[in-house]
Regions:
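Zinc-dependent deaminase catalytic domain
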Residues: 1-145
Length: 145
């Protein structure tokens, strides 16, 4: 690995560690996911999975244990947050603790995000395949710290 590649790898690992820490803000019991959007080495947005603003912070249905249908994924929270700001996600990198699902992948494409770095696999690989088809650079880090 050359110097530039090593330097980028180190940055990727740092941002993924930060995304993991951010995931701790989630009230979801089944899975906590964190996301950061980075552009020009600056964090322009962040998100974690959880309920929309104004809703009770309970992600799972107490009777079934299943995730409530209105829970937002970390990627969607980060993308909608940057959309409300003066920043642009065009050309940015998304760091997320789990690979994006199909719905989040559509948002990633539309947001102009050009690179996605993640650790864990989501139960379906459809989202990652869609991102590849869209020409988005996908990096899975095998050993997340």
């Amino acid at each position: 690995m050359g110097y530039e590649e090593h330097k980028q790898y180190q940055l990727d690992m740092r941002y993924l560690r930060m995304a993991r820490i951010w995931a701790e803000n989630s009230y979801c019991v089944r899975r906590q996911v964190g996301a950061l959007i980075v552009k020009d080495k600056m964090i322009i947005s962040d998100g974690y999975n959880g309920t929309p603003c104004g809703f009770e912070n309970v992600c799972e249905d107490p009777d079934t244990g299943l995730t409530k249908p209105y829970v937002l994924h970390a990627e969607a929270n980060a993308i909608t947050k940057v959309a409300k700001s003066r920043s642009s996600s065009d050309g940015s990198t998304l760091y997320v603790t789990a690979s994006p699902c199909m719905e989040c992948s559509k948002l990633i494409i539309q947001a102009g995000i050009k690179r996605v770095v993640f650790c864990d696999d989501y139960h379906s690989k459809d989202g990652v395949e869609l991102l590849r088809r869209a020409g988005i650079d996908i990096v899975q880090v095998a050993e997340c710290e």
